[in-house]
Amino acid sequence: MQKDKGLDEIDRRILRVLRKQARLANNELAEKVGLSPSPCWTRVRRLEDAGYIDSYVAVLNQAQLGLGDTVIIEVTLDRHDEDQIQKFGQALAELPEVLEAYLTTGEYDYFIKVAVDGTAGYERFLRERLYKVPGIRHSRSSFALKCLKRELSPVP
């Protein structure tokens, strides 16, 4: 299968179902997408081999883990040379509270999503972790009030 052009409607149905219920048994998946089990299994393997499915993951409940607050942080670095960008990105990857981090265009250099336990947990994260990473000139933060949509990946 080629990138996207190789996906037919059945492939898309398989991806949509697996995106929500990755632990479904093949028989159940086949029933949901209107195939018999053998062709369904073949299609799933083909989607995996072609790179459409990277992995199967458990989405953890942040609140149950004591990290019920999501904070979006925008960061501007004091320098923009390759070394600084690489070191800052590596440092972010090592911080356990960081759920996602993006190098971006625009007013800020990085968009970072973190999970913390309230304002005290966020203050601790800033003081003990993020602000110890060298090179930050400015940051701006917003607490997420409510998650309206969360998808790991869209299906065209």
Can you say where each PLM-predicted feature lies in the sequence?
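A compositional/biophysical signature of low hydrophobicity enriched in polar/charged and small residues
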Residues: 1-156
